[in-house]
Amino acid sequence: MMEILRGSPALSAFRINKLLARFQAARLPVHNIYAEYVHFADLNAPLNDDEHAQLERLLKYGPALASHAPQGKLLLVTPRPGTISPWSSKATDIAHNCGLQQVNRLERGVAYYIEAGTLTNEQWQQVTAELHDRMMETVFFALDDAEQLFAHHQPTPVTSVDLLGQGRQALIDANLRLGLALAEDEIDYLQDAFTKLGRNPNDIELYMFAQANSEHCRHKIFNADWIIDGEQQPKSLFKMIKNTFETTPDHVLSAYKDNAAVMEGSEVGRYFADHETGRYDFHQEPAHILMKVETHNHPTAISPWPGAATGSGGEIRDEGATGRGAKPKAGLVGFSVSNLRIPGFEQPWEEDFGKPERIVTALDIMTEGPLGGAAFNNEFGRPALNGYFRTYEEKVNSHNGEELRGYHKPIMLAGGIGNIRADHVQKGEINVGAKLVVLGGPAMNIGLGGGAASSMASGQSDADLDFASVQRDNPEMERRCQEVIDRCWQLGDANPILFIHDVGAGGLSNAMPELVSDGGRGGKFELRDILSDEPGMSPLEIWCNESQERYVLAVAADQLPLFDELCKRERAPYAVIGEATEELHLSLHDRHFDNQPIDLPLDVLLGKTPKMTRDVQTLKAKGDALAREGITIADAVKRVLHLPTVAEKTFLVTIGDRSVTGMVARDQMVGPWQVPVANCAVTTASLDSYYGEAMAIGERAPVALLDFAASARLAVGEALTNIAATQIGDIKRIKLSANWMAAAGHPGEDAGLYEAVKAVGEELCPALGLTIPVGKDSMSMKTRWQEGNEEREMTSPLSLVISAFARVEDVRHTITPQLSTEDNALLLIDLGKGNNALGATALAQVYRQLGDKPADVRDVAQLKGFYDAIQALVAQRKLLAYHDRSDGGLLVTLAEMAFAGHCGIDADIATLGDDRLAALFSEELGAVIQVRAADREAVEAVLAQHGLADCVHYVGQAVSGDRFVITANGQTVFSESRTTLRVWWAETTWQMQRLRDNPECADQEHQAKSNDADPGLNVKLSFDINEDVAAPFIATGARPKVAVLREQGVNSHVEMAAAFHRAGFDAIDVHMSDLLAGRTGLEGFHVLVACGGFSYGDVLGAGEGWAKSILFNDRVRDEFATFFHRPQTLALGVCNGCQMMSNLRELIPGSELWPRFVRNTSDRFEARFSLVEVTQSPSLLLQGMVGSQMPIAVSHGEGRVEVRDAAHLAALESKGLVALRYVDNFGKVTETYPANPNGSPNGITAVTTESGRVTIMMPHPERVFRTVSNSWHPENWGEDGPWMRIFRNARKQLG
């Protein structure tokens, strides 16, 4: 039976206005829209009155709901029948954890009530198209129609393909019907294999073969033999990449054989809880570094949010599934798309060349895709610290003559670093009889054929197959699985995981054969033991679907009880679906039909399938010299600053959490004005050291339209000039990931790919001492479509993205582009040796040209000398600022440095040659460094020692004020206000934020950037930052216990425990499942802290599901009530813990006036480094800090204080219960965005009880208790930041 329950409004006023404006633009007479959430409960038994009231209360969340009788025609948008949304999975979990076992499943839709004039059927179709994503949702016209969401179907049996009867044609038909993308020789191979076996193949076997042997999984092109211009080549592409490892194996612990590569890290204190006692402590050991970079291009072109989200999720799983289990740590992301053409902000170079119907626009990708990737990282709890964004779409005269080149098939890059224990780097042995386990969520009928689909050029496969290959994301489930993996590796030698892989393309059909084969075993499996939420799925759908957030593991049979215990505690679903066999054979039994859908020797599936040979021709690039008529420097500057590749990226940065883990030493945002221009990302290796890890990206794809090899060399060079900004030491410490994107088969591209791989793998990297131990390729970067009567295709440039990773000696020695205006000198190190080529630059692009001669690595020895010289200067503390020269050239380098320093520039380019345009806009490799004027001679001497004397040019100095002036020989070349340039640079971000978020907030942020008087972040402390008020109490040796409370989806508990640990507490890991099961109580604890994250993925309101699982469970409710009423206790709730505790008002004495916390005014997750003021309040944790103003990490989507009315707000303030407020950089309490990131009235962001014993706050003090984890800080701070005082106050209070 199905119950229908109304929910809160689904759209804010500005979202409704945006929709109405879209309808008006489409000439649809829609006058009014009202939208609200509707919940559907599928029940297995009726609810009594109390249970019904409980369910209603559970589904009451979000902003307060005014009573409303909807008017107009109903359009009900729900998930597609036959799919289960992540919302449903998490909401159903909450219902069960609150004791509502009669609920089979909860699902949610949005009911749109449309008031409109007379609309034709076609116009109604336009309206429904605007309201839903056809890839993931459907539209019903009555609430009762939602019954279809819960329809159960009978299982369907396996189907066989009549090869023996119909011969080869049967395979050809199956290839088309199932979208297998099999090549002719593979069809021959299968015909031969099954004829020898004397039986017909089943559909599931063919599907499994196609996935396991797709280009996506097998990398056939990279392993192929090559004939170029009739000449046999000595090496495959992959062999040339491996050459870098053979030449420089130093510091690499694992390459080419696992889900990620591993290099040596530092010996540090890894901080985690003991399995037996739950007590957190430091464990001194090597934290080796793993690295991986993936792409998820095809799904992102079809449906950007889930495409990018599952791209990030899959890469995170690769890291976790390295060795015998590892810990993902920090992420990077990248996008290459065609021109944005932002409505009302179209740029002169952006022509509309059309696109295929089935893929979305570049604007849609950049609106939704980054949100999907960020949302996954945020909810999983991994900071996203690095990225790139390029737009390119033009008709150019390249290798194949004049043709369309651009990114209709986008690049969506997802990568990152993690840490792994030394004894877990290598996979273990799989013994015969080992249990084969799937860890993670249930099988769902989604993402079928992603491996094969992404191996085709967009436009080749059937639209329905595209539809089937889109995946869904549930990061909170992946977090639970990762917690299990963490518990396993933390056991050291007792780790129950022998072998682990993630489930990605091809689902279990790819992952399980790979697992057993890599372990030297076969496997026998039971289909019906696989967890599944959809009983009507066929064997093929159960075995081959790409449901995300799953891992496959081999666990020794005697370790299964331990593994089961860990999974139950973390609430991570798992199933034992088979066991390892001696015989190298794969069998899958189906209990329901009592048959064998799969019965194959492993070598048929993974054996010597036909090897590819590429017989290709070289084409010479045409190109045309840059036509300069009509190009003025002033016009060029504005255009280049508007090019998205160059322009400010704030709209891509602030949506992503950059402080979670408490180990982020350098995020994208630089300095007191928080400008996104960092050279590289840096994390600390642990919560107790200054060792660390760095990541940086290099990418120059348009250059490949003129010179394939130069483009690849520049990508390596740029990654190097970016990562050089931190203290690494020997260049051999740097390891690269190479991600290759190409349109294989397009004239000239294959030979170009070979040339580019050779340039990097055989020549440049070995000469520099660099290794590429990991990478990925995507070989179908082309789209085809019909535009009117014309057949069109858009081919991407050959694109190499290099991600550089390194161990860092001291994270405090990371240099940013932030300029200082004291006596200084700016030096350009020009590795282009004065060539100043303008081919394939930003300048050429904004004037719709390609040019003819591009930049290149002019001298490998000088590039190496450059890196060594910068490292020497970093170690000697001689650099005040550093920024590499890249897209936009020297002009953009200087401008970004001036933005970060909020200062003027007085530059002189007289020594850079007579061609001023080329001097300013050439993108040759190099960097601008700022040094003290007194150090200039010594610095130039270091540069000369490294062979760079002829590359160094004095180009002026940074000055206070707002003028940005470039001269040569006394003549002004360019002069403008820095503020004007800053505004131009910000306009792309502003327009994207206006489109995507609340336009009022976007306008306020843009306006703030034009305020030259803004003093930036600043600090005013009312206490001595170096005083440790807890020291006398720590000296007694007594360590009171703090319960570090987490629920499924919480992700900030480790850094919270570390902050309390430093203040003299014993921090104990307490999971809600421990309390609910009665394994742990709160009676032994002095302090309770509820941590940040996304409990239940924030469904049913942020923190509300967590709170209700306490309130609706009598024993646990009593446990909390008793704790809060005990006089000697303290409690702290941060972020998600704050939201949760604000819903426990009925249990917490003196909290009656507390507000609720709801959706931010911007309607967006906000990650900011915000200034707050400590106000006079009873809070015991903030004693002695009143009047202080200091920055703090903020990361939330629902942090806006909601009060009942003005009287409620007045009472809250008059009682003095407000503990922290947001202030602007002038120290004034503010409601203006983004200084107030959520729009809370009067800047309120923390409240306390009348006794001051319980304090809840939205910002994160635990993420910035160490100075080094602050995005910016005054130089005189020591090891501890000012927020450490909160934790020491707690220790002082307990005496």
Swiss-Prot record:
> One short Pfam family name for this protein?
FGAR-AT_N
Q: Looking at the record, which segments are called Disordered?
A: 305-327
Q: What is this protein called?
A: Phosphoribosylformylglycinamidine synthase
**Database matches in NCBIfam families:** FGAM_synt, PRK05297.1
Identify the pathway: Purine metabolism; IMP biosynthesis via de novo pathway; 5-amino-1-(5-phospho-D-ribosyl)imidazole from N(2)-formyl-N(1)-(5-phospho-D-ribosyl)glycinamide: step 1/2
- Positions binding ATP in this chain are 307-318, 678, 886
- What are its E.C. numbers? 6.3.5.3
Organism in which the protein naturally occurs: Escherichia coli O6:H1 (strain CFT073 / ATCC 700928 / UPEC)
GO cellular component labels: cytoplasm
